[in-house]
UniProtKB/Swiss-Prot annotation:
Role according to the record: Covalent carrier of the coenzyme of citrate lyase.
Organism: Leuconostoc mesenteroides subsp. cremoris
Localization terms from the record: Cytoplasm
Protein name: Citrate lyase acyl carrier protein
Source organism superkingdom: Bacteria
Key words, A-Z: Cytoplasm, Phosphoprotein
Keyword set includes Glycosyltransferase: no
Residues recorded as bearing O-(phosphoribosyl dephospho-coenzyme A)serine in the entry: 14
Pfam families: ACP
InterPro entries xrefs: CitD (IPR006495), Mal_deCO2ase/Cit_lyase_ACP (IPR023439)
UniProt keyword annotation of Secreted present: no
Annotated Gene Ontology cellular component terms: cytoplasm
NCBIfam families in UniProt: citD, PRK13253.1
Length: 97
C-alpha cells in the first residue's frame, strides 16, 4: 500500500512516542530521537518496520520522537499513524489488529 498523506500519532508526554509517517521512495527511512536510542533504537525501528509490513507499506519516511514508550505503545501509535496516512480511519484492517 502507498501512503496517501502525512499523518501523526502520539504525544510528547513521558512513556509515549510520537510517530509521523510521510511518503517515501526508497524503502523505510528513519529519523529517530530518543534518550534511549543507543540501547533501543534497533528494537524501536524493528517494531515499526514490522507494523508497516502488516499493511504492505514498503516506502515511508518515519519520524519518531520516543519518550520511553513500551513496545505495545509503539505498535499502537504506528497502527494509528498508518490508518491516518492511508486515509482509512473509518475502515480499519481487522486482520492486522
Amino acid at each position: 500500500m502507498e501512503i496517501k498523506k502525512t499523518a501523526i500519532a502520539g504525544t510528547l508526554e513521558s512513556s509515549d512516542v510520537q510517530i509521523m509517517l510521510s511518503k517515501g521512495t526508497v524503502g523505510v527511512e528513519f529519523d529517530l530521537v530518543s534518550d534511549v536510542a543507543k540501547q533501543f533504537a534497533d528494537d524501536i525501528k524493528s517494531t515499526i518496520k514490522e507494523t508497516l509490513g502488516l499493511y504492505g507499506i514498503e516506502n515511508a519516511v518515519v519520524k519518531v520522537v520516543d519518550k520511553g514508550a513500551l513496545d505495545m505503545v509503539i505498535k499502537a501509535r504506528t497502527l494509528t499513524a498508518i490508518q491516518r496516512a492511508l486515509d482509512a480511519v473509518d475502515q480499519p484492517n481487522w486482520e492486522v489488529l
